[in-house]
């Protein structure tokens, strides 16, 4: 029997194009992406967690949604359905493309040398790239749904679709990535 995400989408055909993210993006076939924190005991175990669950966890990160995992998984499932209807592609593949396009490759860090602090450009680890991408996608969806007729699921679907196309005008996550990389480039 073939296991599909939410009983609908096959994750066997999903490919990660970015070689640095391959070992950190988990698209292992699961029926319901809910591990109940099993992968939070060790440092890099979150890379074993399914990306759909990590997205749901990031959506739960604000005050009014804390702990409402079932509601958040329903929102993510609805968003994936909307993505499938609009793009006619596997929504998990669209999510992977969005993560690749919205994770910054370099950032700045603050270095103090002789009492003078300045910014220094540094490369970003693949794990941090993914964390930043998840955070920006979730933040962009929740901000665009605030005081809007659209539901959070519709806004999340829009954000993922625009991020997968690397649309800087419409995607909050891609805009934030470009902003961080621009600041890092000026700090070289």
Swiss-Prot record:
It comes from Methanococcus maripaludis (strain C7 / ATCC BAA-1331). Belongs to the universal ribosomal protein uS7 family. InterPro entries: Ribosomal_uS7, Ribosomal_uS7_arc, Ribosomal_uS7_CS, Ribosomal_uS7_dom, Ribosomal_uS7_dom_sf, Ribosomal_uS7_euk/arc. It holds the Pfam family Ribosomal_S7. Coiled coil: none annotated. PANTHER family: RIBOSOMAL PROTEIN S7. GO terms for molecular function: rRNA binding; structural constituent of ribosome. Keywords: Ribonucleoprotein, Ribosomal protein, RNA-binding, rRNA-binding. SUPFAM superfamilies: Ribosomal protein S7 (SSF47973). One of its GO terms (cellular component) is small ribosomal subunit. The keyword RNA-binding applies. Part of the 30S ribosomal subunit. This is Small ribosomal subunit protein uS7. It comes from the Archaea.
